[in-house]
Amino acid sequence: MYQEAVMTDTKNPIQVSERIFHTIECLAQNGAMGLQELSTALDLNKSTVHRILNSLICMDYVRQDPETAKYSLSFKICGLSNQILSQNSMIDIARPFIKELSANSGETVHLVQLDGINATYIDKVEASQNSVRMISMVGKSIPLYCSGVGKAILADMPDAKIESIWKQSFIQQLTEHTVTRFVDFMNLIEETRRSGYALDNEENEIGVRCIAVSLKGYNGKSTYAISISAPKDRMSDARILLLREMILKTKHQIESNIY
């Protein structure tokens, strides 16, 4: 039934796949949407979108509210992400150490994994004593060029690879502090290499600073990173120096348990 529903649109399987995943991504980003809203957002006619939605409903990835007639993703999508995360042994290895780091620092700690030109949050520990919560979510991606974790990972790569990732990225001024010139960005990378840690000075989110370090995976390459994030009024330069010792210790603990 699924194949019949989508293949009536086009004989190009790549185009079919793109439309299906664009629909899923659109619903993930916007929440519940009506047929006309989706048609406009995806730039597809309503009959095409309707067939895609029916296919996704048949597979239990999308549900339609009987009262509003709007479409939204089902929890089956969450099940897929949970299955992926459950297969990642780095989460199990790092978890006790990032919990300890969060408890000792009193701040939110993230664990991310390199994902193309982005870093994806694969674990997060929020300190219970602080009421301010970060907008980050496990499963969400963040660009490498404007994040502490991204710079930490990139600093361990050759310059040519960094330039390639930069050119593939959609560089935009997310905040007034976002670095958008490659030469300036490479200066930050050099500073990260010298210090052994990276900073995010409100480059991705106004009012938030973070300190990050890379983590080597089983292949010996820096494909992970951890960070401590907090409102800037709790992240003075003096405190960052104190947090540096904590996060570098955690980096050593995690990597020592991998090899």
Residue map of PLM features:
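N-terminal helix-turn-helix
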Residues: M1-Q87, I91-D92, K99, S256-N257
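Cysteine/selenocysteine-centered motifs that mediate thiol-based redox chemistry or coordinate metal-sulfur cofactors
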Residues: K161-I165, F170-Q172, K251-Y259
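Extended hydrophobic
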Residues: H177-K251
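A structural signal for short hydrophobic beta-strand segments in well-ordered beta-sheet cores
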Residues: V62-Q64, L111-V112, L215
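Short, conserved catalytic or interaction motifs in soluble domains
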Residues: Q29, A127, G217
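Short, structured helix-loop boundary elements
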Residues: P13-S17, K70, S74, Q87, ...
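Amphipathic alpha-helical effector-binding/dimerization core
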Residues: S72-Q168
